Amino acid sequence: CQGFTFPQDVIKKADGSNHVGWCPHTDKKTGITYPSYVICWTCGLRTLREKMPKRLAESSYTAYFLDCVTATALYECYDPAHPLTRTTDRETRVKQFDYLTRELGLVAGSEQGRDWAVPVADYFEGVMSTTSFFANPKEIHAIPFETLSPDPAFARYEEYGFNPWRRVPLFQLVYGDCCETTWRWGDNSHRMPHLWWKKDL
């Protein structure tokens, strides 16, 4: 990633090792799999402040999406150059939103949503999608599904993702006046057309 230095900017675990991420990359030519790593949020804030003025000079963005900021757990970083407790990790992520919304005047959001980010985020992507979507038998990044028609393979997704007897939009009930929420990008309204009307409710 531009703006980051490896391995200096990676979160260090208590034993000094790099914190491995969740999206390993496999080289299609060699078959070798390379792990991904989690960047320390302190370094993320630094790089955000470095990049945004240049980005805004090139394109007049009015909104910005912070990938993973509210989708991952709070971490501890044991690197003496950028140490973090879980509390300071949360505070650093809040500063990223503050920078974008209060200093730059942008609309800013992230994935999944956390209550600690509600005061500083404008929207959360994916809050409306339930775990039944993420647990479906088709890889969630594959678009489109093999079929867009009703399919027994998606019975759990339909039952727990849409059935009003089971689905309680608790996050929206609590924070609906504070921020917007959306379906996950791969679980959008046109993913399964026969369910559009339920997603519009």
Kindly give the residue locations of the regions a language model identified.
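Substrate-binding/active-site clefts of carbohydrate-active enzymes
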Residues: C1-R46
